[in-house]
């Protein structure tokens, strides 16, 4: 580019060269051409228009349905009657409507409308403001004469009686009723009685014999009475034709008549009548010299007659079966099959009969009278002597299923108090004393002297006297004021306890290992329900952390993998210590001012705490023994090479498993069933040591041999107020205190109310966590009907958790969960159904009040009623104990608040209740919002499905985009993938 200098400034000159334009044309490819893409706004408008059309159609259908519903006269009448009908209870604690007539319902509806109109008129000022002149009706004080009547206010005139005109019956023949009765009897087989002269009765029924329907008389020889003429023809001939009128005879020969045919009636249509009697009727009695005998004729020599009543065996079986079928057991849990022969059944029936009612002949009246005239003591001696005389037979009978219980019942009921000398000594020491305590001792001694013969009233009186003595003794106990910790020493025994069950050679195999026998087979009830299998191939890491309600503990199960390097092996012997607590008052237990050493923590010689050490794990063992070296017992060999660990909250099952070692083999089934069906449902997860000790005491009552059973080592965590029952997987966490109790008998001392100890309230876990789980399950299920039905069927007491908040009660009432609970439980358990009815009534009262504190006051007032009903309900559901504790808290809080108010103080927890209610409302609102959004999503899905069904399809790219948006929306709101049931990660929107 050229420049021009003007002075000192350089100015550029533009280029004057002009370039020529090119005439070449560039070709345009198909890819570069524009495409026609449908507008997204048009698609959305189409969807919106189709959605509006469908909504309009739906609203129009609802309007037509409502019009048809309102125009249906029958339905409106029923609704009107049900609206004004009152609710009344039935005899079976149910509820029903006491329906009014249509006129009564209309009258009530008119009265309500009239009252409402009057109120509206009054509020709108539609009334006349004027004065009314009149005379007041006052009684005159002046006495004047007058007539006095004797009619009271209850007098009513006697109504005139209307004479009823009875319709004249149609003229029928005199035998009409007789024929109708006999016709019914021939069809149903009912018994008919004819009363003849002098009060004599003749019984007739129709039976099927020899392929025919024949009349049958009840003859005296069938009841054991033998007379010359069993039926008098002169007194029965009048109704014999009518009896035969409804019989259906067939060709029956004389040879066909046999035992069981006594009393059969034949007329002249049968050859039996024409060939064997001169009378027009023949009633079978038997045979004499091969010829049939007529019961209507007189027979001189009755000894020659072979009577054709049923044989004695059939008669006996008929009576036995009749009573046997009337007295079946009340429990039916299977379908009966024929597993034994009739001979074996007869032996069993005879053995039971002769054990309770020993006679030489059941048909002998003197044998029965002999037992009848015996006194109770003589009868017991008679049974004992009879049992002693037939000892060998009893040894054989005991092999029959259930006969040993019969023998035990007899031995128990006939046992006598063998320690009469001791009872007489008590009488000698207490006689001539009239003080209350001596009289109570005398009443108790009288009941003990009688033994099994004591009556229920005497036992009740003795129990009351023993309770009174116990209360008196407790009130007079004194405690020492000496400083316990200065002198407290509780050294661990250096010697191991001796367990006779582990020393008996009969219970050990050739290797010296304990043989479980039947105990091992029945122990499956523990392992199947409360233990989980440890699979080594999946690793042990998920079992290392053992959580409890207030903390956690590490198991040494990981040390089952042994390193071959010495240095690493030595590192596996080092534990992880918790904060070591010194000996405090929470470590000791006292009763009557004295230490109860088995219920205290172990100390060294100088009084310092003995801390737990690392416990190495083992495979498939039960580890017992708290003093000395532990004892390792192989687990029952039911499933080879399987390892089990107790589920969280059920580690106390190791105590019951250790007790099973000492249980007799024939009682192992009863022991394991009682633990599974009675003990564990009441204890639940993480029970207190007080409850565990009480459960152990209940088991020792039925199985006394378990009192000296050795316990697994129990570690005490004072920081978390928890006790850990150590199993074969040991403990990597160290530094806990150690409980000294070594046997079940020592552990039972925790169950005493007199024991002063903090440790008996420690958890073997915690109730608060269980309660929070129940509340969360209830809140998340209110708007999910399927989950709520599962809760109502399996664990109905969770609904009592709704008492923590009036809002939860109101939402459950609106969702009609209480009505559903009544429907499910009214036929199963009335007590549970009654809980739902009271919850519904309480919610109606709570909803009528808007003040939170007054609503909570209503709930507290109803808690005692809930508690009384809950006592009668089944205790199997897991939430029973949690619900009971919640009601107990309300009852105790109400009592304490009432006492504070009486003393002039005020409850300061008002703001706490309001904050707690707000938190629950947030949870409920979140659930409601989620449900509403789900409804909208499903609604849009339905619209899209309708569009695709009717042919309005979209291109693939648009469909994929909609599916992707819908999936993201579900993930961020529901945290759940709509395609698969697997949980998705929570979605977070990207920042814009």
UniProtKB/Swiss-Prot annotation:
Give its E.C. classification number. Answer: 3.4.21.-, 3.4.22.45
Peptidase C6 domain mapped to chain residues = 643-765
Q: Tell me the keywords, alphabetical order.
A: Host cell junction, Host-virus interaction, Hydrolase, Inhibition of host innate immune response by virus, Protease, Serine protease, Suppressor of RNA silencing, Transport, Viral immunoevasion, Viral movement protein
Site note Cleavage, residues: 308-309, 765-766
Asked if the keyword Protease belongs to this entry, the reply reads yes
GO process annotations (BP): proteolysis; symbiont-mediated suppression of host innate immune response; transport of virus in host, cell to cell; viral translational frameshifting
What's a Pfam family in this record? Peptidase_C6
Q: Enumerate the spans annotated as Peptidase S30 domain.
A: 168-308
What's noted about post-translational modification? Potyviral RNA is expressed as two polyproteins which undergo post-translational proteolytic processing. Genome polyprotein is processed by NIa-pro, P1 and HC-pro proteinases resulting in the production of at least ten individual proteins. P3N-PIPO is cleaved by P1 and HC-pro proteinases resulting in the production of three individual proteins. The P1 proteinase and the HC-pro cleave only their respective C-termini autocatalytically.
Q: Which GO terms describe its cellular component?
A: host cell plasmodesma
**Gene Ontology MF annotations:** cysteine-type endopeptidase activity; serine-type peptidase activity
Q: Which InterPro entries match?
A: HC-pro, HC_PRO_CPD_dom, HC_PRO_CPD_sf, Pept_S30_P1_potyvir, Potyvirid-P3
- Which family is this protein grouped under? Belongs to the potyviridae P3N-PIPO polyprotein family.
Q: What is this protein called?
A: P3N-PIPO polyprotein
Query: Which organism is the protein's source?
Result: Soybean mosaic virus (strain N) (SMV)
Q: What lineage does UniProt assign to this protein's organism?
A: Viruses, Riboviria, Orthornavirae, Pisuviricota, Stelpaviricetes
């Amino acid at each position: 580019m050229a420049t021009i200098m003007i002075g000192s400034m350089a100015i550029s000159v533009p280029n004057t060269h002009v370039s020529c334009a090119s005439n070449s044309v560039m070709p345009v490819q198909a890819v570069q051409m524009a495409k026609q893409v449908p507008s997204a706004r048009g698609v959305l408008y189409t969807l919106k228009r189709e959605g509006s059309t469908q909504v309009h159609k739906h609203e129009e259908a609802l309007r037509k349905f409502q019009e048809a519903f309102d125009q249906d006269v029958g339905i409106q009448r029923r609704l009107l009657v049900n609206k004004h009908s009152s609710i009344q209870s039935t005899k079976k604690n149910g509820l029903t409507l006491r329906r009014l007539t249509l006129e009564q319902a209309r009258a009530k509806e008119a009265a309500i409308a009239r009252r409402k109109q009057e109120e509206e008129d009054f509020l709108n000022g539609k009334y006349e403001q004027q004065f009314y002149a009149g005379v007041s009706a006052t009684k005159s004080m002046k006495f004047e004469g007058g007539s006095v009547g004797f009619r009271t206010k209850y007098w009513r005139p006697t109504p005139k009686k209307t004479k009823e005109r009875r319709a004249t019956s149609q003229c029928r023949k005199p035998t009409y009723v007789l024929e109708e009765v006999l016709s019914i009897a021939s069809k149903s087989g009912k018994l008919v009685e004819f009363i003849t002269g002098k009060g004599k009765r003749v019984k007739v029924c129709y039976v099927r014999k020899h392929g025919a329907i024949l009349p049958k008389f009840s003859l005296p020889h069938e009841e054991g009475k033998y007379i010359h003429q069993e039926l008098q023809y002169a007194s029965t001939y009048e109704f014999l034709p009518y009896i035969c009128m409804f019989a259906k005879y067939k060709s029956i020969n004389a040879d066909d008549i046999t035992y069981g045919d006594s009393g059969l009636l034949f007329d002249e249509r049968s050859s039996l009548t024409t060939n064997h009697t001169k009378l027009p009727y023949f009633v079978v009695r038997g045979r004499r010299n091969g010829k049939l005998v007529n019961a209507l004729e007189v027979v001189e020599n009755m000894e020659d007659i072979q009577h054709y009543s049923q044989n004695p065996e059939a008669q006996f079986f008929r009576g036995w079966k009749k009573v046997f079928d009337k007295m079946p057991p009340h429990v039916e849990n299977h379908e009966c099959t024929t597993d034994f022969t009739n001979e074996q059944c007869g032996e069993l029936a005879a053995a039971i009969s002769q054990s309770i009612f020993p006679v030489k002949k059941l048909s002998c009246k003197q044998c029965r009278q002999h037992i009848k005239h015996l006194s109770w003591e003589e009868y017991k001696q008679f049974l004992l002597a009879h049992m002693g005389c037939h000892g060998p037979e009893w040894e054989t009978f005991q092999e029959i299923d259930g006969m040993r219980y019969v023998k035990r019942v007899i031995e128990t009921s006939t046992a006598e108090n063998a320690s009469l000398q001791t009872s007489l000594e008590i009488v000698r020491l207490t006689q001539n004393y009239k003080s209350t305590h001596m009289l109570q001792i005398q009443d108790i001694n009288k009941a003990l002297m009688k033994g099994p013969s004591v009556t229920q009233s005497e036992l009740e009186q003795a129990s009351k006297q023993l309770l009174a003595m116990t209360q008196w003794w407790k009130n007079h106990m004194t405690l020492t004021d000496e400083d316990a910790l200065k002198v407290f020493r509780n050294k661990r025994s250096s010697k191991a306890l001796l367990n006779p069950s582990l020393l008996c050679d009969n219970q050990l195999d050739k290797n010296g290992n304990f043989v479980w026998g039947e105990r091992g087979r029945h122990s499956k009830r523990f392992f199947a329900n409360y233990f989980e299998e440890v699979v080594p191939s999946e690793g042990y890491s998920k079992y290392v952390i053992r959580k409890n309600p207030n903390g956690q503990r590490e198991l040494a199960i990981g040390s089952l993998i042994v390193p071959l390097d010495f240095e690493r092996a030595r590192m596996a012997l080092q534990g992880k210590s918790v904060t070591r607590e010194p000996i405090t008052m929470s470590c000791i237990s006292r009763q009557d001012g004295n230490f109860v050493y088995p219920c205290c923590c172990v100390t060294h010689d100088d009084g310092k705490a003995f801390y737990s050490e690392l416990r190495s794990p083992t495979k498939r063992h039960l580890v017992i023994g708290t003093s000395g070296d532990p004892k390792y017992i192989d687990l029952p060999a039911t499933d080879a090479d399987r390892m089990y660990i107790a589920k969280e909250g059920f580690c106390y099952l190791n105590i019951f498993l250790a007790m099973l070692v000492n249980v007799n083999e024939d009682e192992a089934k009863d022991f394991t069933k009682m633990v599974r069906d009675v003990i564990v449902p009441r204890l639940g997860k993480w029970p207190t040591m007080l409850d565990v000790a009480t459960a152990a005491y209940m088991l020792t009552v039925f199985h006394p041999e378990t009192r000296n059973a050795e316990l697994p080592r129990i570690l005490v965590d004072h920081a978390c107020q928890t006790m850990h029952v150590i199993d074969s997987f040991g403990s990597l966490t160290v530094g806990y205190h150690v409980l000294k109790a070594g046997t079940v008998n020592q552990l039972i001392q925790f169950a005493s109310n007199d024991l002063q100890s903090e440790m008996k309230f420690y958890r073997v876990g915690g109730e608060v966590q269980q309660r929070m789980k129940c509340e969360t399950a209830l809140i998340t299920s209110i708007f999910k009907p399927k989950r709520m039905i599962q809760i109502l069927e399996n664990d109905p007491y969770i609904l009592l958790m709704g008492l923590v908040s009036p809002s939860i009660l109101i939402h459950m009432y609106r969702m009609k969960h209480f009505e559903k609970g009544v429907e499910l439980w009214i036929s199963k358990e009335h007590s549970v159904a009654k809980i739902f009815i009271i919850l519904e009534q309480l919610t109606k009262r709570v909803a009528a009040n808007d003040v939170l504190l007054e609503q909570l006051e209503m709930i507290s007032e109803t808690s005692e009623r809930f508690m009384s009903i809950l006592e009668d309900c089944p205790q199997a559901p897991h939430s029973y104990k949690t619900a009971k504790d919640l009601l107990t808290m309300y009852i105790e809080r109400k009592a304490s608040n009432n006492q504070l108010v009486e003393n002039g103080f005020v409850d300061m927890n008002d703001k706490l209740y309001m904050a707690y209610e707000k938190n629950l409302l947030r949870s409920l609102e979140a659930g409601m919002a989620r449900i509403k959004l789900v409804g909208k999503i499903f609604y849009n899905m339905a619209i899209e499905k309708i569009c695709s069904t009717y042919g309005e399809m979209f291109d693939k790219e648009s469909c994929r985009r909609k599916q992707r948006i819908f999936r993201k929306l579900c993930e961020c709101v529901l945290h759940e993938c709509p395609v698969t049931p697997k949980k998705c990660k929570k979605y977070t929107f990207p920042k814009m």
